[in-house]
Amino acid sequence: MWSLGNEVRTNLTGGDYSSSEITSVCTMVNSAVKALDSTRPTTMGNNAPGGNLAALMAIVDVVGINYNSNNQTYQTDRPIYGSETTSALSSRGVYAVDSANMAYPSYDNKAVSWGNTAAETVNAYLSSARSCGHFVWTGFDYIGEPTEWNKYPAKSSYFGIVDTCGFPKDIYFMYQSMWDSRPMVHILPHWTHESGNIDVWLYSNCASVELFLNGVSLGKKVLSQRGTKNQYAYTVAYAAGTLVANGYDASGNLIAQDIQYTAGTPAKLALSSDKTAVSTASDDLVYITCNVQDKNGTLCPNADNSVVFTVVGGTIIG
């Protein structure tokens, strides 16, 4: 598809879709696009109902609606899709709002006022007979728009399915459970806490899941329908040890597993690389991941040790 624009009302006279300028400009741009390439449909992202929106929807071939999961309210014979949706807020590895560090929980339970959680959006579009699907804002976190803190030292957005380093947040596994046919199950959060009742969520595409704490079953849950039901919630009284999630097929066979261990005191660093060899060429680049682990090799999720890196034969660039 060729897009004529996104939320263009903000750049037009009057600043909204009631401006007559918007339809004339979009008609002109649509004609120009069709003259250059008539083989692909045109679209645009609209973020407000009312005004000349009906006229705009008649100009393009495919109607893009931003942040309105209930697109049944739009009266048009054109195909409809979510051109920008969700804007859920989360920080990788954080499981409660952390005001001091300006971080949001990795549970899928917070979104901007005009958006929705990831699960809410997915469920809405799965249940819609009108929509072709939706684009999520955003796949990656990015520098800028640190909504809703919007002040120093926050400098990165919180919308991403993965963070700015490319590491998946927990919500990544919800999407995986929806669109990947390979059996999987994912536990959140980590299992290194002090005490109390912990909200444990599982994402899985298996027919059923079962959670174990130190070998004791905490119950089996069955997939009732595709959608947000791919998320399973437990409340678990914390006890140090091993948390295991099993995923089973319809016949009860174990086909997927995820394990979280309680970490001990930080004892060592573990490095891994995205390449097996590095060229001496000046433009070669390698990404090194560093994990803080206890003596048994378990990731220490709460470690805040100060680490200094030095490189011989290369340069640290970020």
PLM feature spans:
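Short, solvent-exposed loop/linker segments at the N-terminal edge
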Residues: 191-196, 277-286
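Short aromatic-acidic-glycine turn motif
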Residues: 221-223, 266-271, 309-318
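Low-complexity, acidic Ser/Thr/Pro/Gly-rich terminal tails and inter-domain linkers that flank the onset
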Residues: 263-281
